[in-house]
Structures are given as structure tokens and as C-alpha cells.
């Protein structure tokens, strides 16, 4: 019996350690019940129809975006972008329980003196934009259940979107009883992109148990799964896309004015590790994992996990009209099939005008490739609408298709037909998307350095230097980073042959761009005085990662492949993309190179980013790993980061190197910065585990307890984070025999890993823990979904390391930089 108990304890510890089956009892508790396609959202439960969610028309944000003049429809689109959350406050409340309380947006919004942060330093600490017209609270607000939320200034008028008579909230549960009904736009929170909603679960019983002091000060209270908070927090598009204007930066980043803010520049400064793990405790491995996201980046598959940690820089939205026009001029067509045919297209809303040219019935769309891997490929509106699902709209349905954060359950596609049938929130979002698209077309104009305060001081190079920069750009960069280009020969336009033949077309295109004929034509185009006008500064094509040599984890993302969560939002052309071949990866402990065969079916590519306003968007690469970070949004700070980042890009020897392996690997490996553990607070597990099993766990793994909290580890400092985070928990796309072999290998690995950790003494050092784990590294790599650990490598064009001839001279690199600053 004792041996049986010990084996059970080992297995449970292994599962907890990798946060996979994570406390399977909690996952089952939260996920048991209905099947996909059988549930409705809160709006439908309350008897609301999509037509009752009318888009707000008040031009409250008129000073944003450089004061651009908008039509009434564009005003509605901007309001939707900024304040419409589509009922996703339910999702962010549920996620607090899945994350064991370490994620809590109400804490992020608070200025309680016991926290590490407040409104006074919210920008510098979180990188979140303080909404104008608010100030720091001096105490708990009795009108808001004692919570320390920002207070609206007396000299400001009311927020028009809070008007519940004009925009009546969804009356379910306790709303209208123990809490107000509220508006369907919620209340302003003091942070742009986050709105407060009365919690319909905050009934009389919850109100009696509520204690604001304990919520801020007592972990046994606020780290309990059954805690019901009086508010839920909804998230709009603005959370990830609003930031300080590069050409009108605030004098004080903690207190911006509306005229200092842009809706399209992107949240380039937010710290997702601190936002999604408010204690920011580096002893927690989850914080270590989130910390791999540099400021201004996040993993878009963090929730619907694909077992790949792939932080991506937040997209700026520039030149949308030019981007769409480029899709047409390059004949960048995608063929839709299956559920992707159900997406709304611009033609469904516009009967004439330029926005009608991007779809041809029954199945052809000319579109931008929005996600970094080019997976958003079913039309501009499909890309806009999908994002709302990814931030929690109709979470009742979405969460039935996977286990959030931890995985361990086969992912199935969320179907547009189910969304339309069961979610008024979804239908309202679809109806408002065309106005959003029109707003983004109008507002996504470039931010030029020459128009920024003091920008001229950074544009002092001679005309001759910039002219040389144009030649260098034409020869080295424009084949990818210009939407204006010579017409490719027949069979050499990759954009026109997306699908199984794409890579062959790409190879022909790439060879053509090396010819003198191409370069001479391209030089003429770049020298033209109108080169920057209506130029997206990208051809928006998908580039094979074998050519880029960048980290492979982003292009390996699988959320949009056939049968996965975003199946209905990617084209058949994307799903039919061929394998790009083999990449080289490096053992994170020895530096030894190995080969990895990239799969087919959509993965393996990265779409070309635009260079519009590149002076303002450093650090570089798809994960913000090339260049330093400066929290100041001033022109001087942006230029300081740009200069350092562009030097690292063009002189790769200046990039950060791995402290353990140095030059044995081509860059930096993200490693844990301190000894860490996977932690599960007592309030999230004790009540669900029988006393006998808790006692057995204590006997066999005494070092895994911190009081009643579970503490699985230790994970030593210096551990490659992606060695653990990228472990492929479930077999995918394999026959039964291969899947069984994978599962057997995984079970054996987890058992041995748990056993190795169990044997460590209570006073084990990092060296002891590393010694215990090291023998298992080859097996961890074998079962990794992405074994590429070097995060800042690649994009060596013009440096001599791209395999295309000698690099540029230092003078030519300086000339190129002089030109880039004018973009």
C-alpha cells in the first residue's frame, strides 16, 4: 500500500510540476459540463439580441490620433475599438481562477498602499496607459465596495459610455439587485482598454463575505477559488493597441492628455509578466515564463495553449489602406474553404467603393496577413473579429475547446456557425467591425520623425548619404520591405501562388531579386520622390524561417492549422503551405547544433513587418529581443533605443549573448533568473483533495509544501525556460502507434522528473537541482514542440551572415540607417 501511495504521489507531483494536467481536479471542475455548440452567452441568457448593442456615437475621444477628422461611422469605429468588450469580462474573471489568483486585473487597477505599484507609477511599472481625467485614490471607495480604484476628477464631465439608460447593461444574476445593472460599456477604470463591470455573481451571500481590507492584505482570503469579487474587468482592443503618440509624446508619461495618445501605435511598453502575474514573484516559475515576453510583447496563444512559448511584439497598425491595396496589387489572394467561408467580408457591408475589391465569390479573398506567422488569412474583418474571441468574447463556448493555460486536452475548432447562432455579443461585434475597419483606414497614417518635437536633430545626414542609403535599401531590403516593386516574372510571384506551391514560387522570386535587372528597377523606384507615398513598406509575404534564421517558435505556432482553434479564421491556402525544410537548433546546455524538420500545413513562415515609423518601434525582431528597452516614450528615448537596436540588427556581434554558452550559440537563451517553483495556493486545491492523499503527499514529498501551499520544484536558476514550457503534452496529427509511443515517452519522462526532484534534500542548491535535471535534458528536447531556444538570432541580411555574399560596409550601413529614420 505504501508503495502504491508513493507512485500516486510521484505521478501527481510530475503533473503539477509541468502545470499540464495541473491539478486535474480543478480543470475537471472548471471544464466539466456542456459540449461545444450547445451553450449561449450571457446576453442570450438575458434575452438580449445583437441589435440592442448599438455602437456609441459620442465623439468623446476626438483629441486622440492627432485630432484626425472622422465621419460618424469612423467615430463609432473608434469607440468600439476603445470601449467595446463584448461581454469578455466574464472570461477575465474566470481566468483568475485558472491562474490560481496570480492573475487579477482588479489588483492591477488598484492603488492600495500595500501593493508594489499605484496610479503614480502605473506607466513605468506596468506600461499601461493612465486614462486622462482620473487621479489616484486616497482610500478605499465606499461606493465601490472599498476598492482602491482611480477617482474621476471633479473638473471632468461624465464618461458618456457609462450611461446605463442609453447603453443598458446585460441584466443577469445579481445585476440590478446587489450590484447596479450598469452599461454594456462598463465603467471607466482609469486604464485605457480596461472597463469595470458589476459582477453578476456578487449576490447577497458574496456581499456578506466580501472584505476589501482582506482582499488586499490577506492571502488566505484573496487566494481562494471561491472568492467572488464585486467587479469583473472587460478588455477592449485598446488594451493592446493604445500608446503614446511618437509625434506628440506626453510631458509626463504617467499623466498623458488625450492629444498625446494614439490608437494605432500599439502597446509597445506593457509588461505582460507583471500584468498577468500581479505579485511579480520571480520565485514562481509562471512569472519566469511570462518574463520571457519583453515589454511590448506577449504570446498570443498563452490562453489557448499550443505548448509553444512564442512571445510576439505588439503590432502597430500603420498604412492599412496601403496594406490592403498592396494585397491587390501583388495579387495576394487566399482561397477559403470549410468554416472559413462563413466569415463576413467587406462586400457584405459595402456595395461600392474601394473596400469592395478584396473578395470574389465564392472563395477568394485578397487580404493582409495580420498575425506574425501570416495565419490570419481569411479577410480583414475575419482578423478583427477573431481577436475578440482571443480576448474572451463568448468564453462560454471558447473555453469548451481547450483547457486554458495548462492544456492537456485536444483542441477543437471554434465554429463561426456556433458563434452566430448562440452569441448576440459575437453578432454585435461582427456588425460593428466595418466601422472599426474604416476608422483604422483613416487613422493609421505614419508617424514621421521629421514631424516629432526635436525630430529634426536626428535627421542631420547629408542628401548624398541618404541617396546612398536609397541604393543600399533597393539592393538589400526593398525585395521584402516595399509594397512598390517591379512586376515579377511569370511564376515568380509568391503572393499569387499561396498554398502547396508557395515555397517554389518564393524560391524563384528570391533568386530573381538577386539579379541586376531587379536591382536597377528597384533603385529607380526607391529614388522616386513619391516612394514613401502609399507604400506599406512591406510586401506582406510569408518568409520561410530557414531564410530568416530567426527563432522558430513563432512560425511553429499551430493555433490556425487545420482542426485547431482558429481553423475557421485561416485560409485553405495557409493550411496547404509546404514544409520549409530543416532548421538548426542548439542544445541549451552544451551548444551542440542539431537539425529539426519543420512540419507542413501552414507553419514555418513569418510575414514581413512594415518599416513605417521604424524609428519609433524599436526594439526589433518579432519578439523585441534585438535592442534595449527604455520606458520613456519621449522622442529622445525612442531614438536612443532605435540607434542601439538598429546597430544590433546590422552588426549582430553587438547582440546579447548567452551567459552560459557564449559564442557556442548565436545569441541569448532565456533562462530562469532565480530558483523557482510551480506554486498552487492552498485555497485552490486543499478542499478538493482527500485527507489521505494530502497526508501521503506530505510523507513522500515534504519539500513540496510551503504551509498548505503546494510548491513543486525546485527549478534551478539558469534553467532554459522553454525547455519546460515547450514540452508537447499531447500527440498531434499522428497515427495511433506514434501517438501511443509519444504518450509512453512523456509518462516516463514526467515520472523520472518528479522522482529526481523528490530525491533532492530540503537544502538543495541550484547546482544540486541542475545535476538532477541534466540527465533528462535530451528527453525533454526530444519531446519539445519547439526546441529552438535562442531568441535573438536571425535576420542577418546585409551582415555577411545571411549566406548571400559579403556584408555591407560600415559606411553603407550608416547610410541605410539615415534613410530608415525618414520612414
PLM regions and their residue ranges:
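Periplasmic c-type cytochrome electron-transfer domains
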Residues: 4-15, 19-823
Amino acid at each position: 500500500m505504501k508503495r502504491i501511495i508513493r507512485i500516486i504521489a510521484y505521478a501527481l507531483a510530475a503533473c503539477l510540476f509541468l502545470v499540464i494536467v495541473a491539478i486535474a481536479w480543478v480543470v475537471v471542475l472548471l471544464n466539466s459540463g456542456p459540449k461545444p455548440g450547445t451553450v449561449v452567452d450571457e446576453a442570450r441568457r438575458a434575452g438580449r439580441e445583437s441589435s440592442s448593442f448599438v455602437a456609441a456615437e459620442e465623439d468623446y475621444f476626438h483629441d486622440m490620433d492627432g485630432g484626425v477628422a472622422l465621419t460618424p461611422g469612423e467615430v463609432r469605429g473608434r469607440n468600439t475599438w476603445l470601449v467595446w468588450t463584448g461581454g469578455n469580462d466574464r472570461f477575465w474573471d474566470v481566468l483568475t481562477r485558472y491562474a490560481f489568483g496570480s492573475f487579477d486585473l482588479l489588483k492591477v487597477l488598484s492603488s492600495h498602499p500595500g501593493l508594489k505599484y499605484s496610479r503614480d507609477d502605473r506607466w513605468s511599472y506596468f506600461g499601461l496607459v493612465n486614462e486622462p481625467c482620473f487621479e489616484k485614490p486616497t482610500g478605499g471607495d465606499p461606493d465601490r465596495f472599498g476598492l482602491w480604484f482611480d477617482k474621476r476628477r471633479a473638473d471632468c464631465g461624465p464618461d458618456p459610455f457609462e450611461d446605463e439608460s442609453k447603453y443598458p447593461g446585460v441584466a443577469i444574476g445579481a445585476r440590478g439587485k446587489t450590484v447596479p445593472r450598469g452599461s454594456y460599456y462598463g465603467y471607466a477604470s482609469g486604464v485605457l482598454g480596461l472597463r469595470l463591470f458589476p459582477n453578476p455573481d456578487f449576490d447577497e451571500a458574496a456581499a456578506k463575505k466580501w472584505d476589501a481590507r482582506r482582499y488586499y492584505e490577506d492571502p488566505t482570503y484573496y487566494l481562494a477559488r471561491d472568492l467572488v469579487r464585486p467587479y469583473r474587468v472587460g478588455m477592449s482592443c485598446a488594451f493592446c493597441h493604445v500608446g503614446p503618440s511618437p509625434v506628440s509624446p506626453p510631458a509626463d508619461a504617467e499623466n498623458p492628455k488625450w492629444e498625446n495618445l494614439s490608437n494605432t501605435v500599439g502597446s509597445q511598453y506593457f509588461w505582460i509578466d507583471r500584468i498577468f502575474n500581479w505579485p511579480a514573484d520571480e520565485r514562481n516559475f509562471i512569472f519566469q515564463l511570462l518574463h520571457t515576453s519583453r515589454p511590448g510583447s506577449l504570446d498570443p496563444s498563452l490562453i489557448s495553449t499550443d505548448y509553444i512559448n512564442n512571445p510576439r511584439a505588439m503590432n502597430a497598425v500603420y498604412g492599412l489602406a496601403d496594406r490592403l491595396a498592396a494585397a491587390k496589387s501583388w495579387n495576394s489572394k487566399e482561397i477559403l474553404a470549410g468554416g472559413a467561408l462563413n466569415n463576413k467580408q467587406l462586400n457584405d457591408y459595402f456595395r461600392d467603393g474601394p473596400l469592395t475589391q478584396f473578395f470574389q465569390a465564392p472563395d477568394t479573398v485578397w487580404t493582409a496577413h495580420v498575425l506574425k506567422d501570416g495565419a490570419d488569412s481569411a479577410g480583414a474583418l475575419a482578423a478583427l473579429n477573431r481577436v475578440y474571441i482571443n480576448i474572451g468574447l463568448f468564453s462560454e463556448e471558447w473555453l469548451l475547446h481547450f483547457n486554458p493555460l495548462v492544456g492537456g486536452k485536444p483542441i477543437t475548432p471554434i465554429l463561426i456557425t456556433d458563434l452566430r447562432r448562440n452569441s448576440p455579443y459575437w453578432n454585435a461585434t461582427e456588425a460593428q467591425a466595418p466601422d472599426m475597419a474604416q476608422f483604422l483606414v483613416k487613422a493609421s497614417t505614419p508617424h514621421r520623425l521629421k514631424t516629432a518635437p526635436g525630430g529634426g536633430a536626428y535627421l542631420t545626414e547629408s542628401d548624398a548619404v541618404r541617396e546612398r542609403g536609397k541604393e543600399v535599401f533597393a539592393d538589400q531590403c526593398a525585395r521584402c520591405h516595399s509594397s512598390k516593386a517591379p512586376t515579377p516574372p511569370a511564376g515568380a510571384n509568391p503572393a499569387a501562388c499561396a498554398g502547396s506551391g508557395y515555397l517554389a514560387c518564393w524560391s524563384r522570386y528570391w533568386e530573381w531579386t538577386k539579379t541586376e535587372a531587379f536591382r536597377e528597377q528597384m533603385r529607380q523606384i526607391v529614388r522616386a520622390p513619391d516612394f514613401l507615398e502609399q507604400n506599406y513598406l512591406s510586401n506582406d509575404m510569408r518568409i520561410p524561417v530557414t531564410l530568416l534564421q530567426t527563432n522558430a517558435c513563432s512560425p511553429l505556432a499551430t493555433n490556425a492549422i487545420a482542426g485547431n482553434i482558429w481553423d475557421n479564421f485561416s485560409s485553405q491556402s495557409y493550411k496547404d503551405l509546404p514544409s520549409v525544410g530543416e532548421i538548426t537548433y542548439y542544445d541549451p546546455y552544451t551548444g551542440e547544433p542539431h537539425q529539426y524538420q519543420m512540419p507542413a500545413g501552414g507553419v514555418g513562415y513569418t510575414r514581413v513587418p512594415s518599416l513605417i515609423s521604424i524609428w519609433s518601434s524599436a526594439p526589433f525582431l518579432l519578439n523585441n529581443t534585438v535592442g534595449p528597452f527604455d520606458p520613456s516614450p519621449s522622442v529622445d528615448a525612442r531614438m536612443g533605443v532605435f540607434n542601439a537596436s538598429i546597430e544590433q540588427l546590422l552588426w549582430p556581434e553587438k547582440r546579447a549573448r548567452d551567459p552560459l554558452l557564449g559564442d557556442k550559440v548565436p545569441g541569448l537563451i532565456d533562462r530562469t533568473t532565480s530558483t523557482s517553483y510551480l506554486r498552487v495556493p492552498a485555497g485552490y486545491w486543499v478542499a478538493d483533495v482527500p485527507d489521505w492523499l494530502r497526508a501521503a503527499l506530505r510523507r513522500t514529498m515534504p519539500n513540496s509544501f510551503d504551509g498548505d501551499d503546494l510548491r513543486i520544484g525546485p527549478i534551478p536558476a539558469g534553467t532554459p525556460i522553454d525547455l519546460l514550457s515547450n514540452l508537447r503534452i499531447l500527440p498531434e496529427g499522428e497515427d495511433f502507434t506514434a501517438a501511443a509511443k509519444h504518450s509512453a515517452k512523456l509518462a516516463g519522462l514526467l515520472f523520472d522528473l518528479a522522482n529526481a526532484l523528490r530525491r533532492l534534500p530540503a537544502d538543495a542548491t541550484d547546482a544540486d537541482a541542475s545535476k538532477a535535471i541534466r540527465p533528462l535534458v535530451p528527453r525533454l528536447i526530444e519531446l519539445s514542440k519547439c526546441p529552438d531556444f535562442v531568441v535573438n538570432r536571425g535576420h542577418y541580411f546585409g551582415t555577411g551572415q545571411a549566406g548571400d555574399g559579403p556584408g555591407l560596409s560600415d559606411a553603407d550601413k550608416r547610410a541605410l540607417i539615415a534613410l530608415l529614420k525618414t520612414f
